[in-house]
């Protein structure tokens, strides 16, 4: 699931009964899902403090995987027992339109190849970053995404 506002709040009201396998909120959308301030989550994450983001994601009972995109700070993948943070080398941002969608596409592409969860997160960050470096809503090519260096740590 990759949505916001009212549809996201309706999903939250139906958890865990109607839990999807995967959601990909940004920090504001995670806040909407959990009833907390998403801007404060992103602010803390920007300072390298991920505990509140991880706790909020784990509070989404029934959802197996939560990818939280954090702009230039990268993204987190949170599961019941693990959490990872992946971040890109800096790029010149030309447009953020479609960057989250590209992140989700990169994650799912890696998943269909059978990659491990942490490598799916790396792919998500690479594709989202490549999209942000392109003008307008241009989708990156595989070679553009592959050119992005992504670091990863297990939290």
Give, region by region, the residue ranges found by the protein language model.
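Loop-centered beta-sheet repeat module
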Residues: 1-2, 8-10
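General beta-strand structural signal in soluble alpha/beta enzymes
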Residues: 1-3, 24-25, 67-69
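Non-cysteine beta-strand/loop elements that form the S-adenosyl-L-methionine
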Residues: 17-28
